[in-house]
Amino acid sequence: MSPTRPLMLYLVGQPGAGKSTLMAALTAGMPFVERKHPVAHLDYGDRVVQLGRHRSEFPGTDTLGMAAITPVTGWVRSNERPMVLLGEGDRLATPKFFDAGRAAGYEATVVGVAVDTMTIGARRNARTDWHPNEAWLRGRDTKSRKLCAAADLVVPGDDLERAMQEIDRLPVGDVLGGMRRP
């Protein structure tokens, strides 16, 4: 199902909340080609793209350079823009990015992925090769909580099935659901 207007789905949440896991579930079974221009992205065909690279640890917009916002905002304003734009993480979760998307006609939905403090702690501790600076982590947590508070929808990061059901009710979820393969 191809949308009649451009759609954007962007997942935000604290490090370890389950954004990458949820995005992987939303795009499960969808074949893609990795592309580098205008920024690294996964091309699922039919003008459906996910910003960033595919990898098991820290995928998505975490793989983009800090200056990625300039080419991404130019892309969403162009005639070659994706019809469905997916993203997750805080790299591009800025007013500049969301405003550019909305100004270009995107129906943008920001979804907060939320879990309790104990779950976040357990998930972070399970990442034995990830030991972030505490000041950096506090900054990310603060930014993520603010983004979730302003999100259009908040889904549980500890109940993947329920989170997917809530997103599948959205116009962008309808498109992705039609493309997903079990």
What does each of the following model-derived ranges do?
Residues M1-P6:
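Phosphate-binding P-loop
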Residues M8-V12:
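Short hydrophobic/aromatic beta-strand immediately N-terminal to the Walker A/P-loop
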Residues G13-G18:
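Conserved glycine(s) of the Walker
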Residues S20-F32:
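A conserved segment at the C-terminal end of the G1
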Residues G29-G45:
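Switch I (effector-binding) loop of TRAFAC-class P-loop GTPase G-domains
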Residues D43-L92:
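Conserved nucleotide-sensing/catalytic segment adjacent to the nucleotide-binding pocket
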Residues G89, A104-N125:
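Conserved phosphate-donor/acceptor-positioning beta-strand/loop module used by diverse small-molecule
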Residues K146-P182:
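NTP-dependent small-molecule kinase module
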